[in-house]
From Swiss-Prot:
Pathway: Cofactor biosynthesis; coenzyme A biosynthesis; CoA from (R)-pantothenate: step 1/5. The gene is coaX. Coiled coil: none annotated. GO terms for cellular component: cytoplasm. Its cofactor is NH4(+); K(+). One of its GO terms (biological process) is coenzyme A biosynthetic process. GO terms for molecular function: ATP binding; metal ion binding; pantothenate kinase activity. This is Type III pantothenate kinase. ATP binds at residues 6-13, 134. It is found in: Cytoplasm. Its main location: cytoplasm. Catalyzes the phosphorylation of pantothenate (Pan), the first step in CoA biosynthesis.
Amino acid sequence: MLLTVDVRNTNIVLGLFTGTGEHSKLVQDWRMRTDARMTADELALIFRGLLGAHTDQITGVSALSTVPSVLREIRVMLTRYWGHVPHVLVEPGVRTGVPLLVDNPKEVGADRIVNSLAAHHLYDAPCIVVDFGTSTCVDVVSAKGEFLGGAIAPGLEISSDALASQSAALRKVELVRPRSVVGKNTVECMQSGAVFGFAGLVDGLVRRVRRELPAFSGSDVVVIATGDRAPLIMPETETVDEHEPDLTLEGLRLVYERNQARRGARRSPLD
């Protein structure tokens, strides 16, 4: 079994895969809050508790982290508790198979690279990936699987929390779809601005990408939503085609398998 670990600023998502290649299947996933202060021992204790009887069935680990302190602890955890298990940490220098056609490839987040890989693998077409997480990322992937760049905006929670904390008369509200775009009270007005406002933000960015890049003006372009808040925002958008909740975990699986295949090729007596 392959354990995939997706660490973001807000949540950590674990995914457990059986099989490989076309026969791979995500059989279980878990979600927990990210704590940048967690140690390797604490991470191991939580992971083992969630995995239960599957702990001893892990044959590989593929992980990414947008939180540097957690990435360091995951590296220690893997060495200390799963030292016998092959693992891949997606960071600069790791081969993903995704050409990064940007000014500084080292600046591109591992999550954006992995999402791009999975999107190209699933659809084999020009893709625009919208990840609704702590930040809202709109990433552009060519028909060849190249990462062309994108846009980063604040996430839904960050924007909503900032509005409440910086405004004396406003308070934090539950982020749900209001009954109308025209709010009848302060709570509904804030919910409308958050939900419909972010849907409009995404639609606006996607349309601009399609206008600016000739290769993205056709009907073959696939716009994919993923991330924690995708189920809330996607139904209100006009440009998003597909929802892939496990896109990042799928990308982590692909990175692991590609690196394992490369290692196997290097060990081949035919080389």
